[in-house]
Amino acid sequence: MSPDAILTALDPEQREVALALNGPVVVLAGAGTGKTRAITHRIAYGVRIGAYKPTSVLAVTFTARAAGEMRTRLRELGVQGVQARTFHAAALRQLGYFWPRVVGGAPPRLQEHKAQIIAEAARRLGLSVDRVAVRDLSSEVEWAKVSLVTADDYERAASATGREAPSGYDAQTVSRLITAYEDVKTEREVIDFEDVLLMLGDMLNSHKNVADEVRSQYRRFVVDEYQDVSPLQQFLLDQWLGGRKELCVVGDPSQTIYSFTGASPRHLLEFRRAYPEAQEIRLVRDYRSTPQVVNLANEVLKRAGRAGGAHQALELVAQRKPGPPAAFTAYDDDEAEAKGVATRAARLIQSGVKPSEIAVLYRTNAQSEAFEAAFADAGVGYLVRGGQRFFQRKEVRDAIVLLRGAARSADPELPMPDQVRDVLAAAGWADQAPAARGAARERWDAMQALVSLADDLAAAATPEDPATITGLVAELDERASAQHAPTVEGVTLASLHAAKGLEWDAVFLAGMSEGLMPISLAETDAAVHEERRLLYVGITRAREHLELSFGRARNPGGRASRKRTRFLDGLWPDEPRAPRARSVPKGRARALLTGVHDAALFDALREWRLEVARETDKPAYTVLTDATLAAIAEIRPSAIAELARVDGIGPAKIDRYGATILAIVASAPAEPSP
């Protein structure tokens, strides 16, 4: 792509970013404004006109997915050789390279999870800890390290920031635990992820020859999501720069949602104080979302007030055509909310929206269970973000081994995607997805993601750089090392924090009530302001369809004491709550049946469900719940239309089980009316 073509593809503000080739540059980019497009085109333009040497550019971001997307964009622009990595991936690579020369031998083993070491450190101190305490203490140790707070400084730092120690412990105990944690690591000769950044930063700071070599290699730096940088990451960035100013940072203070982990927007907000000569460029044209979504997002931030950063917020300007209005629904309880969301998602899928373009977002991971059950009842496939990592799945590892072998004997005359399909077919993949869900469908989904990636690479290929199985394997290896998995089909269930950086055609924001949004643990003004920003992030994930909801009660029949979130004051329309769903509390289905023959029908339905569960290797409740079976036994539907009105049966289950269920009902004699 020519330099002119690179610039032509940009809007005026994005073009300004691309032309700002020499730092320092700060780009304030709102959600959906094309920041990745702007910074990748900036790099590509610099390379194309000869201002940048590709291998001298280091672009760092916070997630493997974002780094992978940046590499893909650069490759599509015809740029090879630029290093786009997370902070940790870049640091780990450099530390591994220099360690043998500076220290000698191999670097210590990387301990990915702190739990075992934290538990041992606590045991040595005589502390009683359970799994939850270990998790909370691990998070506190991580906060201290990324904040550059030592064990000796912890009490003072915690007091100064108003940070409370994990429940059941005081600051002095946490300070002692940090010391014990470091001792256990030293004895076991392991390091954690924070050590990787600390050790490399110290190595660059104290060994001039190492610093000179790194700074000679990397002369230009780009940092994405700069509002989330921690003091530790800033320390390493300063060592990489070595006083130079060839730095471009991109961020949005309104998307700061990781303060609890040590991230701070201070570095972004004070960038021009550190670099008075810095050029500031603002991206506010939102290409992602409809005006309805953008306006709601803007209004949520405006209501934060000056103390909440409203004066610093970028006011987005929607570029898309108008879409449907945001929907607001108050359900009777959490179960009704989950069922309602699943039903609405199923309707979107029927209307043509892909399942992978739908997400249900909530404040805490504990909220996922109700939605998992509801989507299973509705026959809609789903993926819980944060589950087993894609590249850890056995079928994926086996498939990559087969592709690696096929690369050695690949026919250059055959299209690469066709060869990939042949290889995976031998491993059990088929053109059509299996009808059953469960393990078999998950296995197919994973292999289908590899097929889709092969198609994507072939579509981006050029005569000079054709798509090959060798190239596919190399791409998979790079993604595996960065945990950047290809997309698997299914509705996404995720926490709001896990959704950062992602987007979907349709987004359901669930649990929009006080106590969940903001979370009850947000007791300070700063914490509440961050919760508002978290809602803003959730809203701006939606391209077209946006629905916000909450349950007035936690359980069916419970007291409707919940109130909708304060963040939507003046925005949530006054409208009646959703129609009360006919629900059967779990464990009471049989008690609600009307007679002996209904009970017999209920038993027959349960026996059929057990057979289906065994055949499809899936939990029985995911076929149909007891509540749904009880409703069928009471209503005794005689036609598909009647069956479709039963709560818990969606279109997919009608297609799959409808005829069989009607046959079971018809074969069960009804008791005469008294």
Can you say where each PLM-predicted feature lies in the sequence?
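P-loop NTPase Walker
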Residues: M1-G104, P108-R109, D212, G242, ...
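Conserved helicase NTPase motor core
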Residues: T8-L19, G23-A31, A38, L58-A59, ...
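ATP-hydrolysis module of ASCE/P-loop NTPase motor domains
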Residues: L21, P100-E194, Y218, E280-R282, ...
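Helicase P-loop NTPase motor core
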Residues: V27, A31-I43, P276-Q279, R285-G381, ...
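Short, polar/flexible loop-turn hinges at active-site or ligand-entry regions and domain interfaces
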Residues: A51-S56, E76-V82, Y97-L110, A121-V132, ...
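Conserved helicase C-terminal RecA-like lobe
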Residues: R163, S167, K354, S368-V380, ...
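C-terminal accessory/binding modules appended to enzymatic or scaffolding proteins
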Residues: A591-S638
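Small-residue hinge/turn detector
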Residues: D647-G650
